[in-house]
Amino acid sequence: MKKLLLVLLTLTVFNTTLVAKKTKVDTTFTFQNFVPSSPDAVKEFHRTKLLGSSRIEYPSFSGNNQVVTAMNKEMDKFINDFKETKNYVYKVTYSVTGNNAYFVSVLFNVERKNKTTNETLTYNEAISFNAKSGKALLMKDIFVQNYESALNAAVNDRVKQFGITTLDEKKRKFEGVDKKQKFYMEDDAIVFIFNQDEATDFGDKQLFIPFILTDLIGLLK
């Protein structure tokens, strides 16, 4: 009888372990039940890397091993785009604009210097991460299917509110947001980035279009 109970207990433990291994945590990104004030998902550490004569400041992350490993890998790949080339050298700084239980977002300020003319172009790049998986977030990850028309209508309305004249030339026409749109997120907002020759000739020719997340209910996942 004791042997039988031992066998049954062993089988129960084995089956429980097997079920646990088969059960995967859903890491799909969603804003459902989103709490902007939720605790930071990761800890951020300032890093500086020299790639040739390019100087790149960027964050590395610590926390959940599996998640931060993915984030740091994505970040290394991202900053590699700023390595010195035959024609250009880069100076890059950053700020972490959002860090909560749902996402981590980083905004980069980039100065690209032409090594021949010494002319400097300043622009912005950004990368955001799913705090559950560590994967970089794209537009398709945060917006529902077929979001483009409704979102661009909201973007155009916001541009009109700002009173900004957008590019309307054949080769330089403002087309609104697209699938590869640059953006960064704050804990309660998303900001779309348009660098020079992408949206306007006004001021420094860069355009940032912000939306409070609650303004986009119905479009966000």
PLM feature spans:
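C-terminal segment of classical bacterial N-terminal signal peptides
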Residues: 13-19
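Compositionally biased intrinsically disordered regions enriched in Thr/Gly
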Residues: 20-221
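Sec-dependent N-terminal signal peptides
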Residues: 4-13
